[in-house]
From Swiss-Prot:
One of its GO terms (cellular component) is mitochondrial matrix. One of its GO terms (biological process) is apoptotic process. Only found to be expressed in thymus. InterPro entries: TP53AIP1. Residues 1-46 are annotated as: Disordered. May play an important role in mediating p53/TP53-dependent apoptosis. This is p53-regulated apoptosis-inducing protein 1. It is found in: Mitochondrion.
Length: 124
């Protein structure tokens, strides 16, 4: 794994702990990337069966979808957290430009690789 992705992962860790310390009240609103019918805003006909996947991350202590800017649809690599400790293993795109390539068991450590131009998110 390259040092740039490690740095990105560490900065995401720091950003996450900082958000918890400050008690971001708007964090939950950032999870509203799904319309009320529970489907992602991308072409994902076989999306995950559990529509609570985004909301479940809030209860893990760190909001996994903080990084998404809903207005612009862009990602900030400094605050990217995807499915930490949930091990849900999504194989299809579930947000614009984001794909989890491999499922991971619960509690496993992983590093996040982020490409600003092509915008794939990978669990390495």
């Amino acid at each position: 794994m390259g040092s740039s992705s490690e740095a990105s992962f560490r900065s995401a860790q720091a950003s996450c702990s900082g958000a918890r310390r400050q008690g971001l009240g708007r964090g939950d609103q950032n999870l509203s990337v799904m319309p009320p019918n529970g489907r992602a805003q991308t072409h994902t006909p076989g999306w995950v069966s559990d529509p609570l996947v985004l909301g479940a991350q809030v209860h893990g202590g760190c909001r996994g979808i903080e990084a998404l800017s809903v207005s612009s649809g862009s990602w900030s690599s400094a605050t990217v957290w995807i499915l930490t400790g949930l091990g849900l293993g999504l194989s299809r795109p579930f947000l614009p430009g984001a794909t989890v390539l491999r499922d991971r068991p619960l509690g496993s450590a992983f590093e996040l690789s982020y490409d600003q131009k092509k915008a794939p998110l990978r669990l390495q």
